Amino acid sequence: LIDYHSEKIKGTLAKGTIRNFQITENYVLKFLKSNKLEDIFLSRLDYKFICDFESFLVQYYPKGHPRAMSHNTVMKHIQRLRKMIRLAYHLEWLDKDPFRRWKTTFEKTDREFLSEHELSNLATYEFPLERLERVRDLFLFSCYTGISYADLNKLTPNNIWKGEDDKKWIVTNRQKTNTRVKVPLMPTALRLIEKYREHPLTEVSGTLFPPITNERANLYLKEIAEACGLTKNLTFHMARHTFATTVTLSNGMPIETVSKLLGHTKIATTQIYARVLDKKVEEDMNKLQEVLQSKSKTPKRPISNLKIIR
């Protein structure tokens, strides 16, 4: 089934989606191995198999990760397994669909982003090490364009186009979904491109920015956050979230436009950011209310030495 499914999705899904299926397939094989099995008959795939696979994922610590998978990550793997098993069911390789009574449940999570103040502090901080400055600049470019790390690392001068407005745009295809993305370049983003135009590493690689591995970039982001006094966990996902919230939606850009700039295939994905902003407004209003209430409770001091002049 795994081999058939892998062959079927070749060339039909984005590379990132295919890679995710491969990761799920590897976990299924590890789960079988943990039960001293190399393979299993499709007829033995039942509701208990799904429950046991879920338990295996919940307790499994992926290599190089400090903790087990989150609930939502586990659900994503089970979702992908369901697609494979339902394919077998529709091909009539299975008499019953083991997932007919299964319900995937996802926990609502807030997407962290940098506030305007945090973004400004990060942009103006002077780093003593060039490697940290470089990764900070990559992060900032993502904050001002919404371009993901995977796509950012591949950008070349050929991705810069001149629009009808005579302004420069980044035009690229998202690696994750293969969606065409066109993003107008703001002055900050243009300055960052210009900064690295003649950098020795970009001249060798032919890219807009000096290339760096994802692992190393994430390692340096931790140092950057510590140096800037940020308690938030800096990631390139957060940079995209910052573009969606602080840079665009907070400044009145329509959600449909933001969705297009981010390369989302569904506007529902972008609406998550709008809900995050609504929650922040609610929290800020609650804080303001607390301040106003504390002021109203403060006893007023009598004014001494007051004379009435007639």
Where are these regions (language model features)?
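C-terminal secondary-structure termini that scaffold catalytic or DNA-interacting sites
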Residues: 199-203, 288-310
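Catalytic-site neighborhood detector that most strongly recognizes the C-terminal catalytic loop/helix
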Residues: 113, 174-178, 214, 262-287
